[in-house]
């Protein structure tokens, strides 16, 4: 397919002239182009694009003949015919230069290896020097309307209603003329034997073109009627012509024929192009399709283009370029797929939004191989004379095109480069290899074929292009090997390619390049195989002589299929040989099939393919046998897809001793037509048992009709198929891109599209060409097609087949999107239909989607992306959204349930929404979905605050605007703040988009807040009852719950601990703490004096303070702190290390059983910690501070000093003030540095003097204000740098002399002034 590239080039004419060119016409091979002006004809060369010769008519001759109007080439490029205004036909001979043989010659440096291997070597790389010589003019005595060149004759239509047949040698054979009134016309050829049509009086042919494959002329009359004239014999005579009309067409303007597809394109004054074909049975003109702009894509210009001025088919007949009287260019594929139009988007508008004037074209023509489009701009009457002179030299434009060969890879080819897709080369697979289903990969390599948007550009060397331009790419299955073959051709072009030309194309088989070529030296058609590892030389090639010219070539596994010029098909087998020093291959003819009965002309065959696809009888074969055998031949005959499959009606004879590849091949059945209007065909040479539907299907591109797939139907669970059901079905579907390749297993279509970049940087009076046209690039595109196929199967009541196909593709990453697309497309079509649908498809689609676990997500995502007006229709088919919401809650899919909550909020009254939101909120709290909880809090605060208790009114679906689906959300109080794609990822946001009323609504706001607080309190109580302290802490931190104040209120209710053993067990389990372990030797008796009293080891009994601590009664008055305590604590680290060592050797025992006989009473809670060995206290350092809140105040004095550093300051707030002082006095001074400064605020000043001086650096300076001045002399000098300067004024001056001098640089000067003067020095 064709794509614009870059900016158009401007060709400057070296000869200055006051005349503007107005017509351009290429030669038969398109190497030369004739440019015509009023009295001048010029010949241009295609590559390089240079002027060769120009002929200027004299004034006297111009007055006699009139101005030039039209030009036509002789098929052998030896003559040119020019039609003049006064009815003369001027014939020119084109003669090669005598002295100067070449107009331009390349100059090579000395020593460069440039040798003339074959005749014509330099002619191919240099522009020849030509001259024009006028022959005797022919006077037809009437104005000439059009010219048409034939093989040996020139057909001329005049305004007097005659057709003149002139021989190119006008002297020898004279001329013949036919009056149009004598030609019989009818609607078909079967009834055209009647009398002549009398209504052709005064009518003449405005435009005509000869179609070689139809053997006739497509004509447009001056009254707008169109027709087709065909001769009954080889000679043009009155009794040997007959014609057919096209009914109801009276506005024809021009015509262009497509020889390869046998199509006739007629331009109309309405701006449309009608494409006709000739019915093979009746001979009538049958409308195939239309090429026209649609109001959907071009609402501003679709009916303002004016009449069609010119139509030009590309050299390969695959696309048609159309231009109108009002200007503009538009490109369509052969069967109507629209590709490019310069009347819209960046072509028609500047970057500031102003509209450009469209480019008006007077003539255009395709260049060699379609890489260029030569365009002549028409003169504009509104342009001033000065600007007209400037534009005089810039009237010839050359548009650059790159095109695709429609193969298994996305590969684009330009004039001198290749555009190859980027990806992982390790995932590609050689098409020629026949892998079994067990070893074949399950994918074609998604990352390889998708790659990314960048192209890998392979620049072809200029030395290769000098003799081999233009380049052609055929059957490029592997993008890596395309690059390799181009490098090989560049390196060895002088050795091989100067002796042969490629005629049938290239293909890869394993490591061999298969070439169908013509040998110049032997004058023989050959089939050559070059090994990849050796030079591209005949010495390393396997050569097979052929008996006819090869037109097309293709490879299927170990077979090569050739289509020849005699309309025959040959099958060859290829076998690798290892008998020589280098690898080689042998080629053997297997079968030859004659198609001359079915193919009227060999040029009509577009493609030939071997495939394993069969019709109904072929489905009964086993999958491996069918996938690895060449069962059918597919021919694209002028858009008709014809299949020849092997005849298995008789027994298959095979000798037992013969190898499998020498078995007798079965003959082929008569051909059958599978489809019409086919542009491209894709089949797979691989097999995959898990995806047989996609791998054994046949994929077709049909232009305007979209795509078609010939899908196999398999019985479920290997059951016997029904006799009344077909084994295959043809399913059509539309896509938004032009397909270039099909990824079978990945259910994707890859393509390309033109993207434009505006360039408005130049500000001048004359708008430059770069500003008139945007810069064109080619971007890769892809589209999912699976939902189209599933829908078509459901329409045809093939739900079982659709389910099998969908289940085989359920592992694809975008399969949820496939289901969503299917629901969305069906919903849009049915809900917006103005007529009632007798058998709606949406309920069937909904039932189909329920077979997959993604049903709930699919429905809600589709609803969120659809207009609100269609929701009632959707949920009438899929079910009540309240039921779907409850299903989501039961399935614990809270994110999807939140999306359904948005649906309910818009379809139900606020009370229902609040009820379901409460359910979702409580469930989210239980599961710890804190993001969802925060959104639900905002949702509950906003919902129902300013709305009435009536459901929203559903707008009608009769009249809808493009923005009607979004107006609703702008008026609601809640909407999404993220796209629906983020919901699939598990996150969404609810945002308040309408400001809430103030003033009177404060009561409702407080009620909503109280309602939410009650739910939060209820959840906190539930967590506390279940001793889920970790979840309670996360709950408080994530949702901003005031835990401290709530615990103070609940300390006599739910915060009261009744079963301490169970609470401790839950605590260890919740925080994943191990239970305390002690050596077995340290326990002598579990009970003492009615209480649980463990006997410590001898090492612990050495500490007198520890013994007194164990035997003391638990009361609120702690023992006095002694110096022994300090010594006991210093030895604790060594004791713990010894215990750890003993535990690792002596076998630890858990304390769970040891704790079980404890008496569960609140006043004895402090006893629990007394029985823990001091070595376990470091574990308790990681206990969250909020745990201590539930411990009785009498517990603190008995806690080992090493425990206190982990106590959070907020704990002290909830402890009775009377215990503060007594607790801290008993704490060892070494723990104080870890106490947060805020604790000191609640400590009486008298306790600070007993605190060790090392604690003070960690106390915030502001706390010193509340400390008695008498404490300051004991503060360590090192703490003063951290004291804020505002503290010093309140500190007693007597302290200052003891302050170290090093802290003064940190004290603000204003502080020092208030300090005793004696310290300033």
Swiss-Prot record:
Gene3D superfamilies: YVTN repeat-like/Quinoprotein amine dehydrogenase (2.130.10.10). WD repeats lie at residues 63-102, 303-342. It is found in: Cytoplasm, Cytosol; Membrane. GO terms for cellular component: cytosol; Golgi membrane; Ric1-Rgp1 guanyl-nucleotide exchange factor complex. Keywords: Cytoplasm, Guanine-nucleotide releasing factor, Membrane, Phosphoprotein, Repeat, WD repeat. Its main location: cytoplasm. The keyword Cytoplasm applies. It comes from the Eukaryota. SUPFAM superfamilies: WD40 repeat-like. Disruption phenotype: ric1-null mutant larvae show micrognathia, small head, shortened trunk, and short, kinked pectoral fins. Craniofacial cartilage elements and newly formed ossification centers are present but they are malformed and smaller than in wild-type controls. Chondrocytes of mutant fishes retain procollagen II intracellularly in large inclusions. Pfam families: Beta-prop_RIC1_2nd, RIC1. Residues 945-964 are annotated as: Disordered. InterPro entries: Ric1, RIC1_C, WD40/YVTN_repeat-like_dom_sf, WD40_repeat_dom_sf. GO terms for molecular function: guanyl-nucleotide exchange factor activity. Coiled coil: none annotated. GO terms for biological process: intracellular protein transport; retrograde transport, endosome to Golgi. The RIC1-RGP1 complex acts as a guanine nucleotide exchange factor (GEF), which activates RAB6A by exchanging bound GDP for free GTP, and may be thereby required for efficient fusion of endosome-derived vesicles with the Golgi compartment. The RIC1-RGP1 complex participates in the recycling of mannose-6-phosphate receptors. It is a regulator of procollagen transport and secretion, and is required for correct cartilage morphogenesis and development of the craniofacial skeleton. Forms a complex with rgp1; the interaction enhances rab6a GTPase activity. This is Guanine nucleotide exchange factor subunit RIC1. It comes from Danio rerio. The gene is ric1.
